Amino acid sequence: MALLCGLGQVTLRLWVSLPFQTENRIGFLAAGAFLRSGGMEALTTQLGPGREGSSSPNSKQELQPYSGSSALKPNQVGETSLYGVPIVSLVIDGQERLCLAQISNTLLKNYSYNEIHNRRVALGITCVQCTPVQLEILRRAGAMPISSRRCGMITKREAERLCKSFLGEHKPPKLPENFAFDVVHECAWGSRGSFIPARYNSSRAKCIKCGYCSMYFSPNKFIFHSHRTPDAKYTQPDAANFNSWRRHLKLSDKSATDELSHAWEDVKAMFNGGTRKRTFSLQGGGGGGANSGSGGAGKGGAGGGGGPGCGSEMAPGPPPHKSLRCGEDEASGPPGPPPPHPQRALGLAAAANGPAGPGGPGGSAGVRSYPVIPVPSKGFGLLQKLPPPLFPHPYGFPTAFGLCPKKDDPVLVAGEPKGGPGTGSGGGAGTAAGAGGPGAGHLPPGAGPGPGGGTMFWGHQPSGAAKDAAAVAAAAAAATVYPTFPMFWPAAGSLPVPPYPAAQSQAKAVAAAVAAAAAAAAAAAGGGGPESLDGAEPAKEGSLGTEERCPSALSRGPLDEDGADEALPPSLAPLAPPPPPPARKSSYVSAFRPVVKDAESIAKLYGSAREAYGSGPARGPVPGTGTGGGYVSPDFLSEGSSSYHSASPDVDTADEPEVDVESNRFPDEEGAQEDTEPSVPSTGGGPDGDQPAGPPSVTSSGADGPTDSADGDSPRPRRRLGPPPAIRSAFGDLVADDVVRRTERSPPNGGYELREPCGPLGGPAAAKVYVPERDEHVKSAAAAAALGPAASYLCTPETHEPDKEDNHSTTADDLETRKSFSDQRSVSQPSPANTDRGEDGLTLDVTGTQLVEKDIENLAREELQKLLLEQMELRKKLEREFQSLKDNFQDQMKRELAYREEMVQQLQIVRDTLCNELDQERKARYAIQQKLKEAHDALHHFSCKMLTPRHCTGNCSFKPPLLP
């Protein structure tokens, strides 16, 4: 080609130019070294579109003296096809150049001027400005709009490179394996060396070997390195800043072939910031490409999120932030939060597990099985190195609530993970994810139920579903091993945070079924009856929200298990409660619970909510689980209402057998109840559900009641003391609330009353244990609940029952009804509650009943009256507080109004002063203008007289200024 005359060469390039891809190809062996080193490959993608070729003005074509330029007449107009689009060309200085503006408006119209300009500079393309004559020619040829004032022209080869950088495929030039460019620079005394493309895998790579001293330099350092040879003359580099090397480094062979010079341009364009669309090939490993090129392991490892090459050591890191998600990545799912320990990588295919990837192969591509926590590329290495303690699993970035779970993150959504239920088995996340979806979602990173992570469910797996028996067992074990601290994320349930409610409910249903299938499920259930979110599954008592109870409600203690079982959907309930993970026992107060010590304030705060909940779908959280309610926000308020452990059973348990706060049952009972419970939920649901109006307070009672009744058959030692929450529903909403609040279960502890702070509120609110603040209440409650022991549960119902039945209306009458009711009941008829509640529970323990009768006869009236008085006092107190709040608020409003008026006045003053100043300035300006005009006119007049007396004789057109 070089032989062809300039014309030939150019035209050849224009018309024959090989398909763009081939342009860069020097046909030698496909650069093995390159590829091997990962260097070029990475580069290519790195280069991102366009960077590849960079033609410097010296590109062959331009330099070539066009001997035959005569054939190309100056300013000759032609048309060239670029990527199929006709572009006007013009011969300038013997070279055919294309109109850059036309290219920008056609081929590159989707890119901004800045992008095109920056890419052009990065590629080293110099733009020649055309003369006005040439511009006119271009306008007439239709290349430029009439309004244009200038036009830059670039050669065809440069235009191809520019377009290819935006539109084409980006392969680094293919060079032979041990190829090197012989380069020289003339900065200072100059130097020469070999530029080894295979080593050029980052902008700072030491890829130039000095020909004199054989040391290696990076391109931008090499131009500062020179050897003073005898014949060398010193040249002050014009712009020797670090990145000008592309201009100063030239091929030593001035007559290099086109292919060679084009390859050189492409190499020079490689790490030039031309394109910000960095697509790092899988080689995320390099933390951004720096040394990524080197190892296969690196490639794909981090980047692929466990993708292809993933050496187990790399698997965990999230890919360097920039890494492009390649197909594989996507398939495997973006790498999740860096798992604290590589092997435990959650989805990350338990490190070595390979493609199991976040979702395992199943992890449907693209679906994020868990939120990606972007880690800046440099640091990501650190995460892996951090000592595990940094992210102990219990709260490592839980995938469950990844830093910010996206509602769509499949796993989180209880339904089926987006990936499709199937995903589950695939990867660590699989079991849970697939099975129940949510399940896995909540595992802490280390916990992939599958492979390496002890599946520690956070607290418990929020979704009841998705627990395989195995997983469950693991969960229990894990839980024991790593106490689940609801640390960052209060245990999954502690807040509504937990899995998205709605989904959850469905998931729960499903989950329930699934779980039921596996006995283990029950175990898991300990951790996780699906938690019910507020209204989410009002009806499902089974889910009862209890699941979450444990961590969040804290109410669950050892009982929790039971609670969990209660929570379990009926089908599950029967399973034996798993031993609760020890960790659970300690009740943590959820950070999210309002720290309000007295139920009243909470009631005040959330009273309305309560009612809403109470009446809401059959009381939102399932009654059965007091705690479930706990989760309900109101409930949870109530739960938290006493900021001390709401009902942490542990507390009670000090002297007495643990009683589920919610149900006031002994654990043993619970066992029994659990069996019956399934029915309970339904019953609870029934009664409670039935009386939506009934303050959820019923919940505990309801749940308890039903359960009791259910159990009722199996006489189980009932807590004689606990006047149950029975009262709760009995009273009207508030009454119920308060009653509930008051209802203390008078445990032997007596010390704690069971109060449902917001009965209605939480409806589900479990009866809470309160400090003996109101022992009297306790007693009264006991009396009231007179149901006392056995009945106490049922009794509660009794009382409840009255409530329930009569008091659905939840009015003060309830109290009376209750009284009468209790009296009647005292008769020891099976408490209506029982009858009411569940036929199953019809039989009361006789002993319980008798006790109840006595208690009721003796205490009921007085207690009820006391309660009534208390309620009245409470109400008055609330009214007073409300009044004071109102007054404060009004004062504040007044203050704010006064302040606002003051501000308005000040603004007015400022505005007035500004206006005055402006007026004065205007006047001053006007005066100055007048003076200037006068001076000007005077000068004009004077000059007329002086300079042209002849023309101005007598009839001068000057008119004296009109004086104001």
UniProtKB/Swiss-Prot annotation:
Belongs to the SKI family. Residues 652-661 have a biased composition (Acidic residues). Residues 45-72, 278-365, 414-452, 525-587, 610-766, 793-842 are annotated as: Disordered. Inhibits BMP signaling. Acts as a transcriptional corepressor of LBX1. Transmembrane segments: none annotated. Residues 798-808 have a biased composition (Basic and acidic residues). GO terms for cellular component: cytoplasm; dendrite; neuronal cell body; nucleus; transcription regulator complex. Signal peptide: none annotated. SUPFAM superfamilies: Putative DNA-binding domain (SSF46955), SAND domain-like (SSF63763). Residues 345-355 have a biased composition (Low complexity). The gene is Skor1. The keyword Transcription regulation applies. This is SKI family transcriptional corepressor 1. It comes from Rattus norvegicus. Its main location: nucleus. Interacts with LBX1. Interacts with SMAD1, SMAD2 and SMAD3. Residues 823-834 have a biased composition (Polar residues).
